[in-house]
Amino acid sequence: VKVVEFLSYLNSLDIKVWLEEQKLHYQAPKGVMTSEIKQAIGTRKSEILAFLNQAKTPANTAELTIIPVSRDEDLPLSFAQQRLWFLHQLSPDSTAYNLLEALRLEGALNLVALEQSLTELIRRHEILRTTFPMVDGKPVQRIAPPSTVTWQIEDLQGLSTEEQTAQFRQMAIAAALKPFDLAGEPLVQFTLLKLSPYSYILLLKMHHIIYDGWSLSIFFGELSQLYEAFTQGLPSPLAELPIQYADFAVWQRQWLTGEVLDRQLNYWREQLAGLTPILELSTDYPRPPVQTFQGGVECFQLDRHLTQRLKQLSQESDATLFMTLLAAFLVLISRYSGQLDLVVGSPIANRNSKSVEPLMGFFANTLAFRGNLSGNPSFREFHEQVRQTTLSAYAHQDLPFEMLVEKLQLDRDLSRNPLVQVLFSLQNTPQSSSNLSGLIIENMPLPLDVRARFDLEVNYWEIPGGLEGVWCYNSDLFDATTITRIGEHFQTLLQAIVANQEMRISELPLLSPAQRHQLLVEWNDTQVDYPHDLCIHELFAEQVERNPDAVAVAFEEQQLTYDELNCRANQLAHCLRSLGVGADVLVGICVERSLEMIVGLLGILKAGGAYVPLDPDYPQERLS
């Protein structure tokens, strides 16, 4: 076992090991330090001393394990990066993992200070100047030396406002549609559009392989500090970073082996044993054979009163707000899928060590939360199950989702994501609003299609007025009205939960009182006086006069307007009359369900006859 693995094992037992005046010290909770562990520490004392001396970091073993590594050799990708790299090889023209943001800058922009700030950001964060070429058949991280930022500056001052808007839209769309070359070009790119001496648009484009949500907060927070300093002629106020993302990637590869890996894997294998890895949500459209990423977005808000009641319920249950929302969401998805045993994913920052908190890079991981609603428990009981599941998952969050999928050896299905098709999160990423000294900054909406990386991805944020939810869905699977309905049902479900936790899962309502009244009363109010002086085909003729171009009948991919249906029925009626059909004449109609069946019924009535339906499945002798 490598020394780094042994120290990580000690850390998992909450045994602290540190170096003080070249002497090895350790501290353990009562009853944890066995004679075997004490003997192992003694046996490996020289190795541990050498490692701690090299690390040059104090006390906590969680802080010891990530140390700077040599840049003279090829550096591996982290596990999360490796999966994105692999997906890019499968679909090199895909832009599903591209970020594009547009910031409108109003005021006296100091171009030199902005250029210095971006240059310094790229210098201090190696990941922003990293590419991913192939070496000996494997991808590696290649870090370019620091240099002045390369950016495109477009002067649009000579154009009208309408022309500037059109040019911005054109450039944004072109940037969004252009895939990255992970091996050969910078994976963070900037374009500055000058609209007037005091108005600019900054376009930022990045690939997900070098950033996550936490990284964006770092990026904009540090950009603000650097710009403020450089506009005043001051040096950078930011301390140098002791380690970089590449050091984390090397550490992760070394640490996640042996006993550490076995413990993580054994937990997840046991946790997911017997689970069907496919969530069968009913879709509005057939699932394409190969996964697509066309998306749509619907937004919802939970008001302050409901949010406060959810927080109170969480506190009373010794749970977090996320655990409560996740439990409710699992109930919702169970009701919509008909599955009692299901899994929903949730992203986590995966920055468990303070040493990686200030780093940009792709650290985020996905946890698979399993919910079992068998036996129709009360929400209180299910809530406790989810609380326990969540806590144990957090204790085993270091296993990369990519490795979990690989080790589970799931059947590959190109039509959907492996294991997790639906994501749910309550975001708590540190928020650093875009802010540059002396400027008014506004995030600009982009004229781009939404990209959906999952069937459904639900994110909530705390806002002053409660909780704001953004539901991103695959529009090749779902219609917007369906997502709106599901989102409204989630709110109704939450209201029922805070009113009575003891209700059984199956009894929790999804429909609001207004929806229940509409469904049970209004839509069932079908009693109507039938006009006794008109036949069916005559009533149909009146509808043709009122709405000739409206769709009258549809079957599978075919449809007929009222006018088209009337013309076909008239043609058939004339033919039937020529054959002697008239009043009191019975006409058999033997046809499968189709548009032609409706034409036949109307044609017979228009000819004056009466139709006799004959089942095509009847024996031939009976039909004769």
Predicted regions and their residues:
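Carrier-protein-dependent adenylate-forming modules in NRPS/ANL systems
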Residues: 1-244, 265, 270, 283, ...
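His-Asp-centered acyl/peptidyl-transfer active-site segments
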Residues: 71, 91-98, 115, 126-127, ...
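Short, solvent-exposed loop/turn elements at beta->coil junctions and helix N-caps
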Residues: 137-139, 191-193, 282-289, 348-350, ...
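RNase H-like polynucleotidyl transferase catalytic core
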Residues: 274, 281, 344-350, 614
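Membrane-interface amphipathic/re-entrant loop segments adjacent to transmembrane helices
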Residues: 285-294, 376
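DNA breakage-rejoining catalytic core of tyrosine-based enzymes
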Residues: 294-307
